[in-house]
Design a protein with these regions (language model features):
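N-terminal, membrane-interfacial amphipathic/helix-forming hydrophobic leader that caps
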Residues: 1-120, 127, 256-286
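Transmembrane helix-loop-helix hairpins at the membrane interface
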Residues: 176-286
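Alpha-helical transmembrane segments of polytopic integral membrane proteins
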Residues: 105-108, 112, 141, 145, ...
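Hydrophobic alpha-helical membrane-insertion segments
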Residues: 57-68, 132-146, 242, 252
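Juxtamembrane helix-loop-helix connectors linking adjacent transmembrane helices
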Residues: 83-91, 118-188, 199-202
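Short helix-terminus and kink motifs of transmembrane alpha helices
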Residues: 70-74, 146-150, 194-195, 199, ...
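Juxtamembrane loop-helix boundary motifs flanking transmembrane segments in multi-pass membrane proteins
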Residues: 36, 40-44, 86, 120-124, ...
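Alpha-helical transmembrane segments of integral membrane proteins
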Residues: 49-61, 92-99, 129-137, 176-177, ...
Length: 286
C-alpha cells in the first residue's frame, strides 16, 4: 500500500517486516487437580508406611533372632560345659549384635526390594574442609545429645536405660568392640537407614526423608537415653547422603565416630583405671 506524506509530499511504502501489534491472551496458571493431589498424598502415606513397617520388622526380626541365639547358646553350654564362656561380656556383645547384622539386616533388605525407589539424592562434590566441619558438628551433636539423654535417664525411676550397653562396651574385648561397633554397625546401619530408606523417600521431599531417617535411626537404638544423640547424628548423616549421594561418606563418618567414642575413649578410660594391661588398647584376655 502507498501512503502519501502530506507534510512532505513524499510517497513511501511500509516495511514488510512490520507487523501490527497483537493482543496477548492473559496467562492463567493451571489449578491443581484435587483428585491428583489426593492420589499423591495416598501414595506418599503408603510409601512412608511401608518403609516404617520395614524398620519395625528390622527390630522384631533382631529380637527374634537374639532369642533363638540365646536358646542355642544354652544348649551348647549344657553340652560343652565351661569350654566356651558364652555369658561373658564379649559373648553377650556378640549375641546381641550378630543377630541384627547377619540375620535381620539381610531379611529386611530383601523386604525393602518390594518397595519401589522414589527420588534420588543430589550429587554435590564436597572438599576436605566441609567433611571436617561436618565431623566436628557430629561430635558436638553426639556430646550434647548424650548429656541430654543421661539427664533424662537420671529422672527415670529405674535410672538410665543405657547403663547395660555402656557396661557391655566397657568390659568387652577391644577386638569385639572393633568388630561390632566400628565395622559391622556403621556398614549395616548406614546401608539401611541412609541408602535403603532414603532412596525410597526422597521423591516426597528432602526434608521429610531426612527427618524420617533420623527418627528411625534414633528409635533403632532401643532406649530413650540414646535416642537424642542418635536422632541428631542420624539427621546430620542423612543430610550428608541427601546432598552427596555417597553412602560411603556416611559409613566413614559413622566408623570414625564409633572408633573415637566407643573404642579409643573406652580403652583410654580403662587404661587410666588400671583395667588394661600390655600394649595400648590391648586388653588382657581373661
Amino acid at each position: 500500500m502507498i501512503y502519501d506524506d502530506e507534510n512532505r509530499g513524499r510517497v513511501w511504502e511500509p516495511d514488510p517486516q512490520m507487523q501490527a501489534p497483537q493482543m496477548q491472551a492473559p496467562q492463567y496458571s493451571p489449578q491443581p487437580d484435587p483428585q491428583q493431589a489426593a492420589a499423591m498424598e495416598r501414595r506418599q502415606r503408603k510409601q512412608f508406611s511401608h518403609v516404617g513397617m520395614a524398620a519395625a520388622a528390622f527390630m522384631l526380626i533382631t529380637l527374634a533372632a537374639q532369642v533363638v541365639v540365646m536358646v542355642l547358646v544354652m544348649l551348647l553350654d549344657s553340652l560343652l560345659g565351661d569350654f566356651i564362656d558364652f555369658y561373658g561380656f564379649s559373648g553377650r556383645m556378640l549375641m546381641s549384635s550378630l543377630p541384627m547384622y547377619l540375620v535381620a539386616f539381610p531379611a529386611v533388605a530383601g523386604l525393602l526390594q518390594l518397595v519401589p525407589k522414589c527420588g534420588s539424592p543430589q550429587k554435590e562434590q564436597w572438599g576436605f574442609g566441609r567433611f571436617a566441619a561436618f565431623f566436628v558438628i557430629a561430635m558436638g551433636i553426639g556430646l550434647a545429645g548424650n548429656i541430654l539423654g543421661r539427664l533424662v535417664g537420671i529422672l527415670q525411676p529405674s535410672g538410665p536405660d543405657s547403663a547395660e550397653l555402656d557396661q557391655l562396651i566397657r568390659n568387652s574385648n577391644v577386638w569385639v568392640n572393633l568388630l561390632t561397633t566400628v565395622i559391622m554397625a556403621p556398614v549395616v546401619e548406614e546401608l539401611f537407614f541412609r541408602k535403603m530408606v532414603m532412596d525410597r523417600l526422597l521423591g516426597y521431599g528432602q526434608k521429610a526423608a531426612i527427618i524420617m531417617s533420623g527418627i528411625m535411626f534414633g528409635m533403632a537404638h532401643g532406649n530413650f537415653s540414646q535416642f537424642f544423640y542418635a536422632f541428631g547424628i542420624g539427621l546430620l548423616w542423612a543430610y550428608v547422603y541427601a546432598k552427596t549421594g555417597k553412602v560411603g561418606y556416611t559409613i566413614g563418618f559413622h566408623m570414625l565416630f564409633n572408633l573415637l567414642g566407643g573404642v579409643i575413649t573406652v580403652e583410654l578410660s580403662k587404661g587410666a583405671q588400671g583395667l588394661t594391661r600390655g600394649p595400648w588398647m590391648i586388653r588382657q584376655i581373661e
